[in-house]
Amino acid sequence: MTTREQRIEKYHADRSVYQAVPKSESLSRTAKDRKLCTSLEEAIKRSGLKDGMTVSFHHAFRGGDFVVNMVMNKIAEMGFKNLTLASSSLIDSHFPIVEHIKNGVVTKIYSSGLRGELAEQISRGLLNEPVNIHSHGGRVHLVKSGELKIDVAFLGVPCCDTFGNANGFTGKSKCGSLGYARVDAEYADKVVLLTEEFVEYPHHPISIAQDQVDLIVQVEAVGDPKKIGGGATRMTTNPRELLIARKCAEVIFASGYFKDGFSLQTGSGGAALAVTRFLEEKMRRENITADFALGGITASMVALHEAGLIKKLLDVQSFDSVAAESLARNPNHIEVSANQYANYSSKGASVERLDMVILSALEIDTKFNVNVLTGSDGVIRGASGGHCDTAASAQVAIIVAPLVRGRIPTVVENVITCVTPGENVDILVTDHGVAVNPKRPDLIEALSKTDIPLFTIEQLCERAYSITGKPKEIEFTNKPVAVVRYRDGSVIDTVYQVKD
């Protein structure tokens, strides 16, 4: 009878041959605490980070995020250079990145948006290479296509177990959905969790799973959840924004798409988020129930869900603490990843099931192109977000915006920067009137049967200019500071350095 060794030697198909390993050695390699790091510095060292690599972050804590600055400051202190920073978005509190750019720590950026001092400095030429501005769905497309290769993802979570199972809706600092982080956890070469506390294994429900996580480090705080629902995601009390929201609700009622089983999303911005307030009464009166609401979920949507008026909530990002807590207790409040939410090249994105999306704008022009990125001075002060993803996919895309802001017109002849192309925008609702894209005669016909006064967008532009005067053209240099990527990865516009 032959031995096992003889049988293997006779035929092993050119595969490696088993080598015995003492069990003590196997157990050492698979120690239960092997992922735990005693400090952030240890986690960075063990991640294998090297100069020239790409580090990524999520922005579920929005204005309350602590992780980006904490990690980037430590990375800079450790002497790393020439890194690509790929955060799902960057906001005002990330101003320390300015120094990291000046010192050569960060030389390239991918982000959905920029705000505050960081945006101001980049708009004035701080970064040698233009920032890649992508949509939320577009980011996933760039990651999956291989253009945006994430070497190390640093993901903040309120709590997890010591093996890496985590979600964003348990623990002290609840941020809600980890929809953006889930993409990084799946595609990054190395995943480092930063957590405030540990819970018993196995932690459940699971948003980020143990088989995706390499290293874990406990820190004092990953974010301030009280600052999630501020800025662009605040709930407005502004009378003008509420007027626009009420007008938008009337347009929705008359559109032909407001019927039992409809679906909707509201984008960021006071008026857009406020629309849900004005839907409830009509839904109750006409016994209409929405099948689902999508996107950034708010307290207003949770209230409609718990009242039985919206059957399901699909949550890629929780816009306030009420939404974060709802995710934990309501079984039909469902977390979705950014891939499931809006990726152009996924096998099925939830945006493709939308009937209506209500979105804000910094500018909209007479061709219905929308700018949500640069201000009237040409400085970056916003984010692409899911704007172009949802506008392209929803049956009806509605823009809500004031006709003018102070002495600045919102409706203009040409937007400074195009993020969402006009062919995907259907209706504009302002405090001075409503305009429907001529390419949607069905909507023009439906709204013409109501007492809603309709204008051409050219008429609204003229009215805006009669109030503010025609804006002066901004002077730019020839240096590009950002390229705006459409959801399929193509370049839809380029932002140039503002001339001082």
Swiss-Prot record:
UniProt superkingdom: Bacteria
GO molecular function list: citrate (pro-3S)-lyase activity; citrate CoA-transferase activity
Principal location class: cytoplasm
Cellular component GO terms, alphabetical: ATP-independent citrate lyase complex; cytoplasm
Reactions performed catalytically: citrate = oxaloacetate + acetate; citrate + acetyl-CoA = (3S)-citryl-CoA + acetate
Assembly notes: Oligomer with a subunit composition of (alpha,beta,gamma)6.
Protein name: Citrate lyase alpha chain
